[in-house]
Amino acid sequence: MFKPEKIVKIEVITLTRFRDTLLTYLHEIGVAQLEEVPIKEVQRDTPNEFYRKATSYSITLSRLVDTLKQYLPPKKGGFKEFMFPQEKPKKKYKYKGIEALIKDVETFLERVEPEIRSLESEVSRINNEISSLEDTLESLQILSNLNVEVEYLRGGSFLNVDVGLVDREKAEPLIKEISDVVEGRVHIVRKDIGARTLLVVVSLREDSSKVSSVLAKYGFEKIEVPEGKGLPRDLIPIYTEKIKEKEKELEEVKSRGRKVAERYYDELVFYKELMDNEREKGNYLSYLVRTEMTFGLLAWVPEKDVEKVVEGIKKITGGVAYINISEPSKEEIDNVPVKLKNPEFLSHFEMLTEMYGVPKYNEIDPTPIMAFTYSFFFGFMLTDFVYGLLLGIISALLVKGHSKLKDGTWKFAKIMLWSSVFTMTLGILFGSYCGNALDMAGIKVPRILDPMEQALTVLMIALAIGLAHLFTGYLLGFIVRWKNGDKKGAIFEQLSWLLIIIGITLFALSSRLGVPDLIVKGIFGIGLILFMIGEVLANKGMAVLLVISDFFGFVGNWLSYARLMALALATSGIALVINILVEMIWGIKIASVPLGALIGILVLIGGHIFSTAINALGAFVHALRLHYVEFFGTFYSGEGRKFEPFAAKREVSELEIET
């Protein structure tokens, strides 16, 4: 807690024949972050033919999965599935090496791929035929405006026939220009259809190029005349029936596709996951160095997992391995990957810290402080017992439903569960139960503070909380800088603000505490002098401008905590409006039917659910902002390098490694 997980560096050199099994072992336990070995004049490892095949088969399997996915029955989904998702069962695979795995995949694909490709090809063919028939049907519907049999619209040995559409305003000049170009050797049938005009242009074969040139000039859209004989309107039922037959044929093929998906989809996903993980392993081979008989790797490993890693390496290699374990050097500190370490009941708040950025290896992890202050700020802004209870119930259900998955939803729900406790507690202190609903119902509610009637007091409390929050940040910054040897920064950039905040606090409390003015002014003055010296040392000629800018920046950050009061008032205000609206319509009756009461109950429940949602969203965003902008700005950079282990991603598969 407060410090990241202790990380050590492991360097391994062993025989090349152990490479595949060793990489697979490290990939499956997922506790080591592989790094590129920092040696320039050395040969790098490269993917062999089996890893290249894994990449190719990963792509092939992905396409086959996408093909069959469309034939699966629709997922149940819905609210229940979101709240209580089912964990996918995992199928075991005995891993005997990548060569054996590739052979198994090839055998599987030889059996499955032709059938799926055939299905895909057949569906594509039928869809193309249906599309072609629909185009023909559309053409017939247009041509049915002419009382001309289709065989006369195709032309012949001596005559050329062009049938198509043109914008109505272009029809007249088009007809005139064609007639002029071919010197009247043309016959044109015209039929206006709304804003378009249907034209049949009959010309001599020898004039076809001249006619085509004019038609193109006016944007003539040619219509392909369908096969068959008779009037277009007589052919429409025939083509409609053909489309129905093709759609029936397509449905039969899709029915077969559903059976194929039922047989093979799960296996495809299983082998795809196996290939995806082999593909990822292959991508890391360039991190390794090798000779003709040996290879070397470098990894960062949490200290608590070192024993497991070393035991696995020794077991796989039979002890034929050089293993060097060392702590990060001073030069490596900034490059050490950071894994946050907090008690289980705080670990879910790491998600909020990581959203901003992890600390450097030698910096403080703000998660424990953020866990309390974030939940408190959230509760202060939402500040209603019933709203907190509703949020807590939903969060508890999500925590239970996602407990096996331990996914992002589970972490977020745990954060909201903590926040709901603070919301209910502060709701009791402020006497807020759906706003003033109980007061309006004639029930006297005890409260320490009413944000609607004592807004100025709530504002003073919010600013006091903000000052304490900023003080904590500067104090943490002072500790980190002093410990890391940056004493100048600790004094001029952190201690200066600590003294200024102490001076402001003593000034505000001087009348109650009886602190002499000399002490108050002395502490504030020393802080201000240190701050100004720090600005001069850091910015030289620009110091005068930046002193003013940075000081008022601090004041702005402090005043930003007024949003605690503002959102608390907003929550109470929205709840008050809902309650007044319910009171206004409650007494309405129509023929002795208490319609107002029925509508009032709906408005009361729906309104407060909406108020909970909108105000919880505001509390979530603004509580984050107070940490990311105001609090972290005092001491925290978030410029660390997150620990990203070399780890398999498994949802449906599980490896049993044979060494």
Curated annotation (Swiss-Prot):
Entry keyword set: Cell membrane, Hydrogen ion transport, Ion transport, Membrane, Transmembrane, Transmembrane helix, Transport
InterPro entries: V-ATPase_116kDa_su (IPR002490)
GO MF terms held by the record: ATPase binding; proton-transporting ATPase activity, rotational mechanism
Transmembrane segments: 376-396, 415-435, 460-480, 489-509, 518-538, 542-562, 568-588, 590-610
GO biological-process terms attached to the record: vacuolar acidification
Record's bilayer topology term: Multi-pass membrane protein
One Gene Ontology term, aspect cellular component: plasma membrane
Gene3D superfamilies noted in UniProt: 1.20.1460.20, 3.30.70.2170, 3.30.70.2750
Location in or out of the cell: Cell membrane
PANTHER family in UniProt: V-TYPE PROTON ATPASE SUBUNIT A, VACUOLAR PROTON ATPASES
Family indicated by similarity: Belongs to the V-ATPase 116 kDa subunit family.
Record's function text: Component of the A-type ATP synthase that produces ATP from ADP in the presence of a proton gradient across the membrane.
Complexes and interactors: Has multiple subunits with at least A(3), B(3), C, D, E, F, H, I and proteolipid K(x).
Protein known as: A-type ATP synthase subunit I
Gene name linked to the record: atpI
